[in-house]
Amino acid sequence: MGTDIRTLSIGPYTLASGLRLPDVQVAYVAHGQLAPDGRNAVLVTHGYTSGPSMLSPSHHTAEGSWAPLLGPGRPLDTDRYFIVCSNMLGSSFGTTGPNTVNPATGQPWGPDFPAITLADIVGVQHRLLTTLGVTHLQAVVGPSYAGCQARQWPLQYPAMVEAAGAIVSGLTHPPGLSAAAQRARLADSPEWHGGRFHAHGGMPETLFALRMQTMRQYGLERLYQDLLPDPAERQALLARQCRDWASRFDAHSLVVLAGAAEAFDVRHRMDELRARLLFVVCTPDPIFPPAPAIGRLVRSASPPTRHVELDSPYGHMASGVEWRRLEAELRWLLPA
């Protein structure tokens, strides 16, 4: 299977709240071949505002592309593993979410899309994988918000997961990330229209401004300083990328996905984990800053664990930019 994004119906899905989503569609990419016994799969999870194209060399995500880590002989070895990356439930890149059509109305779900949890996101991923024939995961791994999913997986499906890796991530949701805070920021915009902005052309300017702020916070400007000496050229490139994202992402997804992570906290459940654990943090990272107490907690877990602190000027972007420094860690997670 190649780099094209595919879409698969997994049927109706009942959320943790008890509400039922009809005919959930899941967008995903897959690389490599699934073994006859279905046990050679690896799930790569994506971040808060990105999607399955994080594995594409031409894609720019907030956490950086993982394309250099994917391929024959690389840590995400397509000769050995069946690599899947699916768009999260509630996101904006092909999976059922606020920008997809509500069958009951024929219109985008918009603000009527139900609240979801991280367990729902992982549950939909599980349904996709089992529909594809996967019976076991050699690893679940991803950066930032994706690392929270990777931690949730061995708690929710302990018998299915061999290893879990969280890169530039944490054991709780990011401080300050909440559905209420995101909704309040968006509601201040004249593009909001009471949340019914789909009928008014969306929120392109608001999302563009938010994306510019986010990418600067993540360290993208620092990266571009090393690549482009001309400040005007750097700003133009940053603006183009942020404008492109703003044209494709749905503002309601910011609210839905923030809400999904609010209750995430595995600090008191580390003793339940039986999967091999990798935890990589970066200094400095304004989103998930390293914390000695978290490092001690990870290292004290009962399965084999590896806690690594990278010193990088690229902050939260180190997940993709510093991919060479991640190679050894991912090979530990996925040993030959």
Q: Predicted segments — roles?
A:
Residues 1-44, 58:
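Catalytic-loop region of hydrolases
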Residues 106-108, 112, 119-138:
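Conserved acidic catalytic loop of the alpha/beta-hydrolase fold
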Residues 160-243:
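Alpha/beta-hydrolase-fold enzymes
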Residues 273, 279-281:
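Short beta-strand/loop motif that positions the catalytic acidic residue
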Residues 286-292:
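Conserved alpha/beta-hydrolase "acid-adjacent" motif
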Residues 304-336:
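Catalytic active-site module of serine/aspartate enzymes centered on a nucleophile-bearing elbow/loop
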